[in-house]
Amino acid sequence: VLGAAGLAVLIAAPGRLYRLGGLAAWALGIVLLAVYLAPHGHRPLLAGAAVLGVVLAVAGAAVLKRWPWLLPLVTLACVPARIHVTVGSTEANLLVPMYGVVAAAAFLLAWELWRGDPRMRELGIAAWPLAAFAAWVGLSILWTGDLRQGAIDLLFFYLPFGLLAVALARLPWDRLWALALLVELTALALVFAAIGLYQYETRDIFWNPKVEIGNAYAPFYRVNSVFWDPSIYGRFLVVAILACLVVVLFERDRRLLIGATVAIAAIWVGLYFSYSQSSFAALVAGVIL
């Protein structure tokens, strides 16, 4: 509840000091949730890892301060990077690199607010609805039937990605950097699609034994590329296809138009072999909208 309330204040509060307080509450909420979820008997090890993480995050914040546009570029590159973590009897596939980026962004945001940065409500008209949603998510943990799962959702999804949204919104977006991000997104999607086609041809699935077992009994063969789950892989490709489709529909530069069209065709082939119904539904919805 504390972390979600802090995130809500950070998103919508009108003053710098209020936002600093919200950021502090967000950070404290993160720590308390991590302590609650940490396996007993391994907390000293996790505390040591946390200290190392803080040092690396501070260094990352210094890098982002010098080159702020690394934030969206590195964030996008970290999307598929799930690290298999085992602590005692607890196993999980976590977005560890992404959480490192979020921590660096949090330290940079704290520094900027401390130094008197007057910006507020960077998310514009979405600030109040998102703040209300964050607060509601935090409150809902008070009556959830599964407290542990609620804590996991807050710690690994809502709290870090809420702050990341604020950090990204603070950047002075322009056409050049949007194009750079599109190029990175398209290049990653093409590489991932090629890896997916390799998996289909060789029948070699990475990371996830559940997909291998499912393929053994299914009439089709699903691939996951470098992602843990075929559906997550498919959704990443859908985002790339829709971004390229915007270029096809609205860009007048012939080279960009041809390149985007070819990319859509190649990425779609990779998407097909994910056999992800949710991804195809998202693609249809995105094209219609």
What is each residue range found by the language model?
Residues 87-88, 142-145, 169, 269:
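Alpha-helix C-capping/helix-to-loop hinge sites
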Residues 99, 156-157:
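Aromatic/pi-system hotspot detector in well-structured domains
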